[in-house]
Structures are given as structure tokens and as C-alpha cells.
Amino acid sequence: MNKFVKVDVTVQQKQLQPGATGQLLFSVKPGKGIHINIQPPLSITMDDDSSATLSGAMIFSTIKKDTLELLDSSKPIKQSFTLAKQMKPGTIFLKGSFIYFYCSDAEGWCSRFKQPFNVEVTVTP
């Protein structure tokens, strides 16, 4: 848990068939006086249980502040994933990590944070 930034992860499609593509949504809300850098790059990884793989590029909006390009936290980060074709019907959990760098506007410090996530998806026949 990061006391400076609140991250909520949801899945756009709660029910998917084996081999289907879904989308993870990352709501990133920095506290007052904190911003999220996009350099070094944001990173999303899935735990290695082979139930799903990331597909396509991460999609996010940015804003300019002076010479910096920052994450626009008013819009979610979107990352597509594809379920394995051999998935059996039932409930699964997509687990992984979201890595980002957050910084203090006033004090100038920055820190890396690895946010674990765990979202539920129902695999349908």
C-alpha cells in the first residue's frame, strides 16, 4: 500500500470466453502535491501462471507541466490481455504488478513503487 498514491485495478469485461481479449483498467489517484512520472516508463506485468498474457501497448493520457510530461490521472490506464485458449469455465484471478514512479511537487523527491493487483474474471463456455 502506498500512502501517497491510490491505485484501483478493475477489469472492463467481467466475463470472457477462453482465448478472448479483455482490458485491465488502472485508476491512479496521487495525493495532493504528488505526481506520476511517465519516465522511467510505467510497467505492467502478469504473474507467471499462464492464465492470461498482456497484449498490445499500455494506453494512457499525459499532461505537460513545465518541461515534464506526466500521467493524466483523471483518466484510467488501459492494458489489454488475452486469456489462454485452454481455460476451463469458472472463476480465475488475474494477478500481476504495476510499477510506477511518483514524485513530490514541493520537495522534489521521487520513488519507485510496485503495486500488486489481483482481479477476478469469470471464464464462460
Residue ranges and their predicted role:
Residues 1-125:
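Extracellular/lumen-exposed scaffold segments
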